[in-house]
């Protein structure tokens, strides 16, 4: 329970910092662009859990180590250009589109251009997570198995929900911003 309380407090601190940093300048963020605090917190927690699993002896540790390498690389790419446009969602949901949001368009264009590569990264990550599930099942490590199953579901959600959402953000911006965006 104490761990969850700390996670909630950390999330609130990140949200407060994000709101404070963005007040007075709607979406005119300077590079590097922010990633939504909830996603930052989830990434951090996932990488910490995976690090603990990778430190385990035997096949579970080996397979978790493989996933950790893939996930760190993918998370770095996500933080670079995939996730920052999501910070615009609260504004878009309120019907607010301003010219200073155009910073997101090159990132969104990159997501669109690299869809196949992003898909392949998720497929490789899912394959590695399946290896962790097999190792965890053989080792009777229910925690590792559940972690891998949940991480695989998160990866699928990225492809089914996150990527299309980012592309819709781009379409919304392009339809409401003045040309040449």
Regions found by a protein language model. Name each.
Residues 2-6, 13-15, 20-181:
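Small-residue-biased structural context
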């Amino acid at each position: 329970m104490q761990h969850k309380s700390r996670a909630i407090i950390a999330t609130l601190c990140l949200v407060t910092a994000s709101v404070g940093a963005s007040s007075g300048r709607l979406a005119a963020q300077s590079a590097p662009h922010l990633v939504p605090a909830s996603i930052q917190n989830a990434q951090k927690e996932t990488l910490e859990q995976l690090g603990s699993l990778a430190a385990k002896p035997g096949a579970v540790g080996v397979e978790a180590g493989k996933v950790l390498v893939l996930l760190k690389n993918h998370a770095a790419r996500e933080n670079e250009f995939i996730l920052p446009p999501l910070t615009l969602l609260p504004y878009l949901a309120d019907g607010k589109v301003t010219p200073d949001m155009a910073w997101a368009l090159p990132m969104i264009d990159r997501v669109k251009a690299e869809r196949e590569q992003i898909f392949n990264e998720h497929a490789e990550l899912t394959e590695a997570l399946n290896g962790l599930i097999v190792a965890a099942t053989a080792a009777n490590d229910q925690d590792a198995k559940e972690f891998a199953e949940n991480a695989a579901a998160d990866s699928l959600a990225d492809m089914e929900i996150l990527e299309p959402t980012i592309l819709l953000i781009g379409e919304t911006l392009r339809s409401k911003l003045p040309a040449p965006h």
